[in-house]
Amino acid sequence: MAGLPDRDKLIRNFSRCLNWEEKYLYIIELGGQLAPLTEQQRHPENLISGCQSQVWIAMTLSAEGHVIFAGDSDAAIVKGLVAVVFILYHDLTPQQIVSLDVRPFFADLALSQHLTPSRSQGLEAMIRAIRTKVADLSAH
């Protein structure tokens, strides 16, 4: 997560944006800070179904048992949403991720109201897929 802000800084930066155009640009900027995926990480098993755009999310466990995320999308705003989700789940264990409901966070940022229905559905699909895959990750 090199380069991405922590959760508190994300909230501060988001609140400094004067309008939704600036907020969208900030989200896109966050997506641009994600490290590129390897060809191996772009494997079909990492492709998230339920998203209108192509979204890949790869997860591994650190030696400390925290989930390490890598992700990408072919749509800039979606790639930014991937980055926001990674910020929220940063440094958590699989059990913590499964039990953490991040939807209220998106509601607090008013993101839910300002995304198109297809983007909102895609965001929900991403969160569901992460929680499902992370449960499998901890089982192995």
Curated annotation (Swiss-Prot):
Keyword Cytoplasm found: yes
Annotated metabolic or biological route of this protein: Cofactor biosynthesis; iron-sulfur cluster biosynthesis
Keyword Transmembrane belongs to the record: no
Keywords (A to Z) from UniProt: Cytoplasm
Main location: cytoplasm
GO cellular component, one term: cytoplasm
Classification via SUPFAM superfamilies: SufE/NifU
Source species, domain of life: Bacteria
Compartments (UniProt record): Cytoplasm
GO biological process, one term: sulfur compound metabolic process
Active-site feature positions: 51
Family matches, as Pfam families: SufE
Matching InterPro entries: Cysteine_desulfuration_SufE, Fe-S_metab-assoc_dom
Subunit structure as annotated in this protein's UniProt entry: Homodimer. Interacts with SufS.
Function as written in the Swiss-Prot or TrEMBL entry: Participates in cysteine desulfuration mediated by SufS. Cysteine desulfuration mobilizes sulfur from L-cysteine to yield L-alanine and constitutes an essential step in sulfur metabolism for biosynthesis of a variety of sulfur-containing biomolecules. Functions as a sulfur acceptor for SufS, by mediating the direct transfer of the sulfur atom from the S-sulfanylcysteine of SufS, an intermediate product of cysteine desulfuration process.
Family to which the UniProt record says this protein belongs: Belongs to the SufE family.
Database matches in NCBIfam families: PRK09296.1
Protein name: Cysteine desulfuration protein SufE
Organism: Yersinia pseudotuberculosis serotype O:1b (strain IP 31758)
